[in-house]
């Protein structure tokens, strides 16, 4: 049945010590202390490259004009690099100029915020905490 406690087996300390000793000796067999080091001739050797952004490594090198032009050309936006859009996604924002010159004084298209006495009064009331905006 599930409720009965099991009897504890008394551990033999001599037997437990013998098990721990065998475990310790097995671990010592797998460990090896390396005191002599050498290069493995079968391993591929990779050349360590210099850091491209460090200033002290690049002092003696002259600036390559062709490489600098290539970097500056790659940093430009696609509209400056190409005369036409190269992909369909570029076509969406390719012509960023307005089709119609915006006339700021034309009130038919430009609805600027106009402040009068009543709008300033109501804005002040709302900022002070009046919450009944439906009156």
From Swiss-Prot:
The keyword Transcription does not apply. The keyword 4Fe-4S does not apply. Residues 77-97 are annotated as: Disordered. Pfam families: FAM183. InterPro entries: CFAP144. Keywords: Cell projection, Cytoplasm, Cytoskeleton. It is found in: Cytoplasm, Cytoskeleton, Cilium basal body. Signal peptide: none annotated. Belongs to the CFAP144 family. This is Protein CFAP144P1. The lineage of its organism: Eukaryota, Metazoa, Chordata, Craniata, Vertebrata.
